Amino acid sequence: MSALKKRKITEKQPETNSDSEAESVSSRGSAKDETQTSGEEPAPAKSFKELGIIDQLCEACENMGYKAPTPIQSQAIPLALEGRDVIGLAETGSGKTAAFALPMLQALMEAPQTLFGLVLAPTRELAYQISQAFETLGSTIGVRCAVIVGGMDMVAQSIALGKKPHIIVATPGRLLDHLENTKGFSLRNLKYLAIDEADRLLDMDFGESLDKIIRILPRTRHTYLFSATMSTKVESLQRASLSNPVRVSVSSKYQTVSTLQSSYICIPHKHKNLYLVYLLNEFAGQSAIIFTTTVHETQRVAFMLRALGFGAIPLHGQLSQSARLGALGKFRSRSRDILVATDVAARGLDIPSVDVVFNFDLPMDSKTYIHRVGRTARAGKSGVAISFVTQYDVEVWLRIEHALSKKLPEYQVEKDEVMVMSERVAEASRQATIEMKSFDEKKGARGKKFGKGKRSRDDMDQEEG
């Protein structure tokens, strides 16, 4: 082990053994999982070394700015290092990626092998971010990752797989395409599987692809499943994919973190634009995500804010993959400080320092509300979330408060101060309407070109919102 710490990974190629056949989906689910919650556990560990992480990876954690393990890391990592299958239930921004990446990398160092680990994620952006985390944490040991997602060239991906990476990070649809069609590609010797954002994977109808992948993977493996919630579908996936797992939890079903200041603002629907601009000026200089419910509204709000001089960029599922990654890159680097987004940005994206979340359009359910406001107040930092409640949203807002089991305070503003900007905002809205006409025409042309209907397997990891 000590020798491995001082050199890069020199791996053996996995042997191709036709006797290593895939299990059936139901064969691993006979044992019940144990349960332990954060309330039963001691305080989080003070260091990764205390959890059993080796010095080389501890140093990588320091380089990434991980000062101390988060609660989910403190609970999950020791169990994973013991060789247990783990189910991790934790809120967005709790450090789930490192909770499965560190044990996987440590095991890779102890027994170097190509095609060692597989991580399944629901969206293309999340897959790239997980891969980046693996490569950064494993940089001193020469870890190689391949990202296999829809919308990219199959041949180039086949070449990347042919180079035998240590870790594959993939969305289920495209991975299954390669397992079924790419000559010479096999995961029969895979040692580790991590399923991230499991509830989101199943919400996006990846269930059939997951079922097929799990049947193909070897029976003898370590599996980690991480999810924000434990739904009936996730329970079924757990029974199908994990063997005698232990469950760790640091959040309840509908819970926001204590460092989050959540409030609402009650306004007439016709003045939503005005109040948004007023609040953005109130929080000037801070990074913000503005959530909307439709692609059209995302683009319109972004156009309007740009006309007013704000550094706003849109993010939604109808942008090209390169445009989406470009938008995220600009927002992370703070060259743009306002992201206008559909719920494509509510889960799993690596945006570590969002100061404010605005629910410009209310989500229709409490679960989505939790995921949206989870973009701020992450990893112990404070954050603000303000929801716009118009005369049409009262019933939805009351349902959200009921699910949270608390009444949230109203954010107070002076109406006269808000109305000062009315003429400028009205003009910016008119400009946005003109730009939207051009946007809708282009979108219509794309629809005629490519046709409509049920999404293909290749497009399932690109959210429609």
UniProtKB/Swiss-Prot annotation:
Question: Which terms are listed as keywords in the entry?
Answer: ATP-binding, Helicase, Hydrolase, Nucleotide-binding, Nucleus, Ribosome biogenesis, RNA-binding, rRNA processing
Instruction: Tell me if Ubl conjugation is a UniProt keyword of this record.
Output: no
* Annotated ranges, domain Helicase C-terminal: 275-419
- Residues bound to ATP are A90, E91, T92, G93, S94, G95, K96, T97
Give the Gene Ontology MF terms in alphabetical order: ATP binding; ATP hydrolysis activity; RNA binding; RNA helicase activity
Annotated Basic residues bias = 445-455
Q: Residue ranges of region Disordered?
A: 1-46, 436-465
| SMART domains for the chain | DEXDc (SM00487), HELICc (SM00490)
Q: What is known of its domains?
A: The Q motif is unique to and characteristic of the DEAD box family of RNA helicases and controls ATP binding and hydrolysis.
- Show the PANTHER family listed in the entry: ATP-DEPENDENT RNA HELICASE RHLE-RELATED, RNA HELICASE
In UniProt terms, what function does this protein have?
A: ATP-dependent rRNA helicase required for pre-ribosomal RNA processing. Involved in the maturation of the 35S-pre-rRNA and to its cleavage to mature 18S rRNA.
Recorded protein name is ATP-dependent rRNA helicase rrp3
Instruction: Print the organism lineage.
Output: Eukaryota, Fungi, Dikarya, Ascomycota, Pezizomycotina
Name of the gene: rrp3
